[in-house]
Amino acid sequence: MDASSVPPKVDDYGMYTTEISHHNPIELKNLLSSSDSRRNSQDEDSLPNNTNLIKEIDWQGEKVKTYPLNYQTVPLVKLQVIACLIMFVVFGMNDQTVGALLPTLIEYYHISRVDVSNVFIVQLCGYVMASLSKERLNKHFGMRGGMLLAAGLCIVFLIILATAPSSFYVCMFCGLPLGLGIGILDSTGNVLMGSLLVHKNELMGIMHGLYGAAAMVTPPLVSYFVEWGHWSLFFLIPLFFSIIGMIVIFPAFKFETASKYDYLCSVENKESNNDVEEAGDNSLMESTKASPGFFELLRNPAIFLYSLYLFLYLGAEITTGSWFFSYLLETKSSNKVAMSYIAASFWTGLTVGRLCLGFVTERFFENEYKASKAYAFLTLSSYTLFVLVGLINSSSVFYFVVLFFVVFCCGTFIGPLFPNASIVALQVLPKRLHVSGVGVAVAVGGCGGAAIPYLAGVIAHTVGIQYIPLLCWIMVALFTLEWTLYPKFIKGHEEYF
């Protein structure tokens, strides 16, 4: 390669890439890096106050345009943020739609709970496909291609679902491409927000808050469409947001090409090599040390425990959100509209917890581990009340108010556990394992988010749906126990515990 192709260091430019071209992952690298910490605390007035910050660079015969990830000075970044916020509304609705429609699908298609639970497994397969194909998508099509593919998949298959397919297996198959699209959107949104130069934490909270808010309003909305007699038309709502998102994605990501992905990956390789000594021109195209494999990463105690924690956590969270509505209808009341509001209490609490408890953590706890430990015990206490209150059979208004409040508390305290655990994991892991370690843990956690709800469907079918709260309590108790013992297995990082 000639010297003109060697890119300069671009410390002031955020990294969008999910994995580097030489198999060295860099996704979410900037979330807790020291340089980003300095940027996040930088006074906003010191940032350049002009919009002409897009630079054009020659890279392997093509023009690559780079710019700082500052939405205040680069309008294009603001559009990218807006696109991700819109698509996270689709993400939230998608995650709760299956749970809200479970009773309707069982009745409409004359299938069992086990059959309808297969949707969780199919969506997991799509999400895993997204994890395995992210690097290849970015390498060949850039982030722009990945985002357009994701929004396009949502549009096409939401249209199919809106027609109320005559076969349940068509609905089940739609979960695969939807899971693929949502997986791409999830990764892109977190990478973008985590790489912003200003207000990254606030915008990350808003994005995940929109996810929770969308999941919160889904059960009541679905119930109204079911009562109306046209349940499938609910899919027109996420379809609308997907179309708007697609319209915004076109201009927002127009410069996020495959060439830019390759350029940024090469820059990252050069910066990694410079930790040893200043590399020569040809070093940009040399492969750095190969990343450890999946099972090798799991042998690291910090990664294994983090993975197990997410497996149990996502199993408890998604099982509660997906099966709670069906549990209410079959054990408490057949009033779908009224029960949908109680079912929404969990997602309401989760949204409140993720938006508000972050401020509590900063002001009242020494570190994220201690905050998460306290929230985990509060979650366990709330789920204990959930199990006990669920044993009572009553149709009084007071009873349902108490049940609403208890489940709201379950959502509130379980909400911040995922992001806090991720912060702790990144604190104790060496920097070179940040992305690969988190990637493995999220993949394992996603398996829990599909396997446990599926197990809940099997239990509901064989022994009764009344045992769903107990299953969730067991998951919460296990991840609380693991989090309590976590420091005993992680040596040399006492300052974080």
UniProtKB/Swiss-Prot annotation:
Glycosylation (residues): 49
GO MF entries: transmembrane transporter activity
Protein purpose: Probable transporter.
Keyword annotations from UniProtKB, A to Z: Glycoprotein, Golgi apparatus, Membrane, Phosphoprotein, Transmembrane, Transmembrane helix, Transport
Gene name of the record: BSC6
A Pfam family recorded for this sequence: MFS_1
Note: Present with 414 molecules/cell in log phase SD medium.
Spans traversing the lipid bilayer: 73-93, 145-165, 168-188, 206-226, 233-253, 301-321, 341-361, 374-394, 398-418, 440-460, 463-483
Lineage top rank: taxon: Eukaryota
InterPro entries: MFS, MFS_dom, MFS_trans_sf, MFS_Transporter
Lumenal side, ranges: 1-72, 166-167, 227-232, 322-340, 395-397, 461-462
Stretches of the chain found on the membrane's Cytoplasmic side: 94-144, 189-205, 254-300, 362-373, 419-439, 484-497
Record localization: Golgi apparatus, cis-Golgi network membrane
Name listed for the protein in its UniProt record: Bypass of stop codon protein 6
Source lineage: Eukaryota, Fungi, Dikarya, Ascomycota, Saccharomycotina
Positions where Phosphoserine occurs in the chain: 37, 41
Topology of this chain in the membrane: Multi-pass membrane protein
Family annotation (PANTHER family): BYPASS OF STOP CODON PROTEIN 6
Family per similarity comment: Belongs to the major facilitator superfamily.
One CC-aspect GO term: membrane
